[in-house]
């Protein structure tokens, strides 16, 4: 009876040991599955973050290129505006010069008219007809707008 009890006890221990081993293997397998699932979940997040970062880098590069092109275009526009401003200033200078010349021409014209009238008045009072024609033609050739 004692030997049968010892055998039965060893049998029970072996059975429990076997069940523990099965449970340990199941626990290890479940732990591995959980770990793999967590790694996969984290990898998806990391992969998404990596893709987002690549996209952000590409967009930042495009934005930088756009800003650089905009700065170049703005600089060109500023140069054109400066050139236009200089051209307008030059036109204003030419206009002032033309007005000055026009005023001088009016003064010269008035002076020539007065000189012509004075010479004509002197000639009519002296009565020289031939010299009058000569002075008239000389005045007319000197001042074509007076005739």
From Swiss-Prot:
Protein origin, superkingdom: Eukaryota
Gene inactivation effect: Show reduced eye pigmentation.
Annotated Pfam families: GCN5L1
GO cellular component terms attached to this protein's record: BLOC-1 complex; neuromuscular junction; presynapse
InterPro entries from the UniProt entry: BLOC1S1
Signal peptide span: none
Gene Ontology BP terms: autophagosome-lysosome fusion; endosomal transport; eye pigment granule organization; neuromuscular synaptic transmission; olfactory learning; regulation of synaptic vesicle cycle; synapse organization; synaptic vesicle recycling via endosome
Region (Disordered): 1-25, 125-147
Description of how the protein assembles with itself and partners: Component of the biogenesis of lysosome-related organelles complex-1 (BLOC-1) composed of Blos1, Blos2, Blos3, Blos4, Dysb, Muted, Pldn and Snapin. Interacts with Pldn.
Family as reported in the entry's similarity comment: Belongs to the BLOC1S1 family.
Its biological purpose: Component of the biogenesis of lysosome-related organelles complex-1 (BLOC-1) involved in pigment granule biogenesis and membrane trafficking in synapses. In response to high synaptic activity at neuromuscular junctions, stabilizes Pldn protein levels and, together with Pldn, plays a role in promoting efficient synaptic vesicle recycling and re-formation through early endosomes.
Protein name: Biogenesis of lysosome-related organelles complex 1 subunit 1
Source organism of this protein record: Drosophila melanogaster
Upper taxonomic lineage: Eukaryota, Metazoa, Ecdysozoa, Arthropoda, Hexapoda
Chain's gene name: Blos1
